[in-house]
């Protein structure tokens, strides 16, 4: 708790010296999100994005999306992820999270495209393979579903996603 207070003071001091600095605003937004102050974090991500010299606005849109998802606002989060992908089409955080949202909306073709793009970036992780498997399952594509199940079993046998597969808990 003491370190959290010191970190907060350091960020506030830095923002006092450079209130429009994109990196400071982004990092303070991340700090707020990680310390369960998600609604407060959005203001700092948006402040970072406002700076025309800030070089990674997609990163702040993605982070805003994640923090907004944590507050149970998928519609608002969706908007942030879409903006991130407009600026950086291969943003992994935006791809996987928007893929999850599209899956929950029943938009399987778009969810499939997003997760496939994500999997091309790093050959997939347990989360993305699990999402791909569930997309194919809902789409009735049993061969593709089995392929993702095999990859999950082979590459991530100890993962919570594989455990859910073994239990038949698909949602």
Locate predicted features.
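Canonical tetratricopeptide repeat
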Residues: 27, 61-63, 97, 131
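Terminal, low-structured helical/coil segments at or just beyond the last alpha-helical repeat
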Residues: 120-171
């Amino acid at each position: 708790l003491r370190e959290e207070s010191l970190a907060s003071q350091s960020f506030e001091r830095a923002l006092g010296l450079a209130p429009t600095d994109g990196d400071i605003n982004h990092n303070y937004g991340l700090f707020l999100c990680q310390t369960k102050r998600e609604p407060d974090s959005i203001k700092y991500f948006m402040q970072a994005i406002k700076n025309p010299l800030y070089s990674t606005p997609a990163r702040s849109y993605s982070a805003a999306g994640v923090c907004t998802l944590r507050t149970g606002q998928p519609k608002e989060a969706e908007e942030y992820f879409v903006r991130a992908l407009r600026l950086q089409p291969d943003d992994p955080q935006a791809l996987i999270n928007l893929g999850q949202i599209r899956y929950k909306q029943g938009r399987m073709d778009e969810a499939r495209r997003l997760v496939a793009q994500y999997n091309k970036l790093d050959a997939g992780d347990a989360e993305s393979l699990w999402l791909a498997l569930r997309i194919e399952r809902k789409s009735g594509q049993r061969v593709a579903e089995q392929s993702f199940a095999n990859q999950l079993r082979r590459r991530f046998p100890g993962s919570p996603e594989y455990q859910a597969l073994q239990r038949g808990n698909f949602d």
